[in-house]
């Protein structure tokens, strides 16, 4: 059986290439990477960066995954990615996709030993606030009270 890490590489890694100027990129890649077998996968993202730099995200900014799990990580810098989104006219087995190339921060879920990406959780134009560095609650209120007492 395909491991979660291998599945991540198959579905999301396309290092050393780019979709720029190729509106057919998603149609070709979604088929080539077996995401149109049995059904059309509605949305998928390919990352055009080295596997090492995507693996490194697992030691970058820890954030909560969309499903509430705590093992997601956001990249410290933007990455060259391609979003593939099924078009309205797409009908299995003739899956059709719109190709959009972007520079965004990516979020991946990581697990295992070695700790590697196993799920692509999303991408954003603006970085998130990491989990541990959220401000401690009530701190500003305490300071305000202390400031008042000294008057």
Curated annotation (Swiss-Prot):
Which positions are annotated as binding substrate? 7, 10, 41-45, 66, 85
The reply to whether Disulfide bond figures as a keyword in the UniProt entry is yes
- Could you tell me which cysteines form disulfide bridges? 26-84, 40-95, 58-110, 65-72
- GO MF annotations for this entry? endonuclease activity; nucleic acid binding; RNA nuclease activity
What EC number(s) are associated with this protein in UniProt?
A: 3.1.27.-
Name the enzyme's class: hydrolase
Q: Which SUPFAM superfamilies match?
A: RNase A-like
Per the Swiss-Prot or TrEMBL record, the active site comprises 12, 119
What keywords sit in the KW lines?
A: Disulfide bond, Endonuclease, Glycoprotein, Hydrolase, Nuclease, Secreted
Q: Which residues are glycosylated?
A: 62, 129, 133
Q: Which GO terms describe its biological process?
A: defense response to Gram-positive bacterium
Cellular-component GO terms for this entry:
extracellular region
SMART domains recorded: RNAse_Pc
Superkingdom of origin: Eukaryota
Positions of the region Disordered? 1-25
Intracellular or extracellular location(s) = Secreted
Q: What is its main location?
A: secreted
InterPro entries assigned to the protein according to its UniProt record, in alphabetical order: RNaseA, RNaseA-like_dom_sf, RNaseA_AS, RNaseA_domain
Q: Does the keyword Disulfide bond apply?
A: yes
The family database entries (PANTHER family) matched by this protein are listed as:
RIBONUCLEASE, RIBONUCLEASE PANCREATIC
Entry similarity comment: Belongs to the pancreatic ribonuclease family.
Tell me the protein's name.
Brain ribonuclease
Which species does the entry assign this protein to? Answer: Axis porcinus
Gene behind this chain? BRN
